[in-house]
Amino acid sequence: MVLKLICFILFFFYSLNVSSRNDLNEVEREKVFKVTALTKNFSKAERSEALSGGAGTVKKFGKNAFSQHFNNLSFEQRQDFLIGNGFFRKVWIASPASTTASDGLGPLYNARACQSCHIKDGRGHLPREEKPLSAVLKVGNYNNINLIPHKVYGKQLQFFAIPGLLSEGSLSINFKNSNFMKKNLNKVFLKYPNYKLNKLNYGPIETSASLSLRISPQVIGVGLLDAIESSDIINKEDKNDNNKDGISGIVRLVTDNKGNKKVGRFGVRASTPNLFVQTGTAFMHDMGLSNSVGVNAFGDCTNDQKKCYKFPNGVNKNSSHEVSDEVMEKIVFYLSSLSPPKRRNVSDKDVLYGKKIFY
């Protein structure tokens, strides 16, 4: 996933038509053009090629490599980064509680903290137990590319519930081995997951419903994607493959939390316009916490789950939602400031050969 993210960013910026940017002056345009121009020399790495996050790229590796901020943040920005990190790691609890700033979890939920799914800001894994901790199972039916929530189970199956309420079910996975022959006649074995729903506590799910297991992605570099000018994305639309490069792309326009049409950037089907909406959606659907994006204090509970609405929520007289915009903005800043680590082995001959194929 890291490689895919870096490749997308590199390909996107290397193919920009900077002449269409009216926010750049001539000097800036020329500078951007030189930096993003496609290379024709694949015998050696380009200057600064190892800097996946530009001038702010961090050079730390190891188990905390994905949790580093851009190294060109100011002192004040680093303070905001640490505050956002605290909220990202914060463990939420059910209402009512003496810590009113941390209650409101559920009633149905899949995680109690952002960090639970994005462990050390990295990628999740396929479930090893019946209740996934870093994956969600989307359920419903698709109308073209839009997911229509399931009448009973909502947008995703919730594997946990607060005391006094049944969770929606559990999941078991077994793996089948598949193999294919490489050109050098060596067999490569891959594991193919088959998952099964167990203990559905609110009735069966019809076979016509779509089920999609999603592993939580790592969150490094998302600020770079969020920072791309919408006009640059729109100018690269080529739905009829007019440039004959074999790639047809269509920009997806979605509605943000304020009712405005925006370019879709995040999610499997580019369903989310920015990190603020992405964060708010995750709070409501994954943890059952209301905010200005997802306003239901009962999260993904549906009208058919009447008992779900009998539990207290975390909205109090001093707030209109369980998660304030201030908390959301700190988390968004934290996510936006996570730097991809420095690329390694950029001068390796196999890496350069792969780069040539990619170009």
Where in this protein do the model-derived segments appear?
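Sec-dependent signal peptide recognition
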Residues: 2-9
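Periplasmic c-type cytochrome electron-transfer domains
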Residues: 18-359
